[in-house]
Amino acid sequence: MRHLLLLFLCPCAIGVAFHLWLFNFSGLFTWFPVWSQRSYDIVVGVLSARHNHELRNVIRHTWLQHLKQHSSLSQRILVKFIIGSHGCDIPVEDREDPYSCKLLNITNPTFKQEIESFSIPDIAALLTEHHVVNVNFRVLYPVVITRLGVFQHDSAAGFHRNITVKLFQTEHEEALFSARFSPASSGVQVNGIWYKPVEQFILPEGFEGTVVWESHDPEGLLSGNVHRVIVNDGGGIFRITTVKEGLLPYEFTEGVEGIAGGFTYTIHEGEALLNTLETRPERIQIHLAALEKEDALLQEESTTFQDIVFVHVVDTYRNVPSKLLNFYQWTAEFTSFEFLLKTDDDCFIDIENVLEKIAHKQLQKENTWWGNFRLNWAVDRTGKWQELEYLSPAYPAFACGSGYVISQDIVQWLASNSQRLKTYQGEDVSMGIWMSAIGPSRYQDSHWLCEKKCEAGMLSSPQYTPQELLELWQQKERCGNPCACEDR
């Protein structure tokens, strides 16, 4: 009897264990049983931010509803929204930038006085052969630069060098301001650094700058290694960025990395910063409560519509490439399909037109990438699309993110190599870099629009509000043209 009981219980235990394994696979919350797989013509992956409920609902009530109402289409197409399973637990006001989830870690800032950016122990400063030295920095809270300075040995009486100091906005060829030091015009010496005043500018949060020291004498500069200099960052107001941290030299950078002087600065609107820091604990508590509510709403939304794949990443802009790779893993593991269409939740998609064109173009089911490709797109070294870890000045060809189609074998390759593929600043350029390794057949089609505009016959168009998406669909339903209907 005991053996008979085990015979019945073991399959159940194995089934439960298998269910739990599926539930936890790669951190994906959506369970898609292997034994109920259906073969689809297209899997549509819609990248969506956690808070974009309205955009998802508009899609559900427009073209996605249209698919479900047509049995032939619903059997051929599977649509899933791709959402990060975790929200950033830091309020936007307390992050280094709105694109990542890094705490703006400012502590004990110095207000209402000039701060010397660098000081250097005697043993750390050496007369070098380098005539041009530079250092890069990033502003994390607005500052005002007041003076530029240059090192000189304490033992020297007076200033006997000819040196120019310039401060650039990174990747710009023209200096914002500069100071020229000479025996006849040496400025004022403070703590071993000679300073001269400069025109005062507010350097905003996120500003990326480069200070360049240039010697006009036969001998080189007195300079120190950036890792041996004392950085007076005002409690975290700015940060030195170095090549040794894995970042590339900027295109217009002159000379070698080092510090041959400094600058003085004041914190702009210190009272506002103090208020931000004092109210941070309360703000974080409110934010965490809102995250819990958002989690509950997303789980309810997922249960109701059964169209969300939660991927195990913190849902921020910088993590979008990882979101996509995680979705490719899920798709390769739990679905059977011929093509995958990737789009965003703010895009208009004409899915029937996509199907018709696949048939008309007779797209191959292997090694195929169909989209609107950007060629020789310059790599940005600053700003939202900053990329410091891709060596070339231009990206490989990549399809606009509003919509593109890839064949099943490419998805399988991406999924199989997802743990080794490096992610870059955007999912579209990351895809171009990844695909350069395997060289798929690219099918160029300008009907995948890269910018927000409406054209007859378009396959996709990006950057719409929920109301605009609804209006486009209503016009398509009314007269077949989402852009305009002629009144009769």
Curated annotation (Swiss-Prot):
Provide this UniProt record's keywords sorted from A to Z.
Endoplasmic reticulum, Glycoprotein, Glycosyltransferase, Golgi apparatus, Membrane, Signal-anchor, Transferase, Transmembrane, Transmembrane helix
- Swiss-Prot/TrEMBL catalytic activity: 3-O-(N-acetyl-beta-D-glucosaminyl-(1->4)-alpha-D-mannosyl)-L-threonyl-[protein] + UDP-N-acetyl-alpha-D-galactosamine = 3-O-[beta-D-GalNAc-(1->3)-beta-D-GlcNAc-(1->4)-alpha-D-Man]-L-Thr-[protein] + UDP + H(+)
Per the record, ranges on the Cytoplasmic side are 1-2
Family to which this protein belongs: Belongs to the glycosyltransferase 31 family.
Name of the protein in its database record: UDP-GalNAc:beta-1,3-N-acetylgalactosaminyltransferase 2
| Subcellular location as annotated | Golgi apparatus membrane; Endoplasmic reticulum
Q: Which residues lie on this side of the membrane: Lumenal?
A: 24-488
GO biological process entries: protein glycosylation; protein O-linked glycosylation
